[in-house]
């Protein structure tokens, strides 16, 4: 009796794993309505990119790398870049690529323009409200992914306190696979 129960439990467990895995892998109009997570990221470089960001020195391209975890693919590495206007603190043309370590799948994210408002009294900058983003495709099992959501960013102001901790981003939204 114990052997039959164990065999039945293993069979049911296997079917659940296969069903869940095949749904995500094949798409079948898979929707994750609880797409959320967070990452830490570090500044890599800044410089002019007139074609993308506009006239220098008012506009710069910024590049970052980092990693985090989310409810879609688990642990991921991330690279992203954006343009910024150094006079207004407007951040625009934000593009990110999250690569899931377990599968190698990538998800491409594009963010709406926003202002990263500095707080010199406490040496940080943050956006004032959730910034809209779009899921703009991907690779592997996430090829053709779509979706949307909102993100928040906080960052230390290194010139204010001399510290260089990673910046933080967290988000929530929906991701869909075709």
Question: Where are the predicted features?
Answer:
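Bacterial N-terminal signal peptides that target proteins for export
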Residues: 1-9
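Bacterial N-terminal signal peptides
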Residues: 9-18
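Beta-strand-enriched cores of mature, soluble protein domains
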Residues: 25-178
């Amino acid at each position: 009796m114990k052997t039959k129960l164990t065999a039945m439990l293993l069979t049911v467990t296997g079917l659940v794993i296969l069903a869940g895995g095949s749904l995500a892998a094949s798409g079948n109009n898979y929707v994750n309505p609880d797409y959320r997570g967070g990452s830490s990221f570090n500044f890599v470089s800044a410089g002019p990119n007139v074609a993308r960001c506009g006239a220098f020195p008012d506009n710069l391209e910024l590049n970052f790398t980092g990693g985090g975890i989310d409810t879609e693919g688990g642990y991921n590495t991330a690279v992203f870049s954006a343009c910024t206007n150094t006079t207004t603190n407007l951040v625009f043309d934000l593009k990110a690529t999250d690569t899931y370590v377990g599968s190698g799948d990538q998800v491409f994210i594009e963010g709406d323009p926003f202002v990263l408002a500095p707080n010199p009294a406490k040496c940080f900058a943050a956006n004032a409200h959730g910034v809209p983003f779009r899921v703009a495709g991907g690779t592997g099992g996430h090829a053709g992914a779509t979706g949307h959501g909102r993100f928040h960013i906080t960052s230390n102001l290194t010139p204010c306190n001399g510290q260089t901790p990673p910046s933080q981003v967290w988000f929530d939204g929906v991701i869909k696979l075709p």
